Design a protein with these regions (language model features):
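Small-residue-biased structural context
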Residues: 1-165
Length: 165
């Protein structure tokens, strides 16, 4: 099933993938302006899922989270942590690796988006409008220090990934 929410969010995945590719077309060059657009877009996308989509589905399940929600939240934590330090080749590679797995969990048949659409039912148009109107998250400057990198590595490991950053 590919309903309205699935199309909207999967389309946003494609937009974000394109931005990340444009931000780093080769390992030696990172376009800071394009990466900043990617970063803001990914934070907004995560916010939409965490603040609008997943709560709407949880409400329809009588307060119980989707079975996939715990894994997706761990991925969101890892991705958000990877957006704190300045982008480097290993950081961008880690973001790409996580998104490959994460987006599949959301987009595939029976995935999170399909489950949410089935649960939300008649509320889809209202939820979609709320998603479209969701604001961008205020981005802060990158932070580059050993504490941030340690926290980022822990977030990646908690999400179940073995990636070097």
């Amino acid at each position: 099933m590919s309903g309205k929410i699935h199309r909207y969010l999967a389309g946003d995945h494609e937009r974000l993938d394109t931005l990340l590719e444009r931000a780093m077309p080769d390992p030696e060059n990172i376009d800071a302006a394009v990466y900043a657009e990617f970063r803001a877009g990914l934070l907004k996308h995560i916010g939409i899922e965490e603040k609008v989509l997943f709560p709407a589905a949880r409400q329809q399940r009588g307060g119980e989270a989707l079975p996939l929600a715990a894994k997706l939240r761990l991925d969101h934590g890892a991705l958000t942590a990877l957006l704190v330090p300045s982008p480097t080749t290993p950081i961008v590679a880690a973001i790409r690796a996580i998104l490959r797995v994460h987006n599949t969990i959301e987009e595939d048949a029976g995935g999170a988006y399909e489950q949410c659409e089935e649960l939300i039912g008649a509320e889809i148009d209202r939820i979609l409008l709320e998603m479209r109107n969701f604001p961008y998250v205020k981005g802060l400057p990158h932070v580059d220090n050993p504490f941030v990198m340690d926290a980022t590595r822990r977030a990646i490991a908690r999400a179940g990934y073995e990636l070097e950053v």
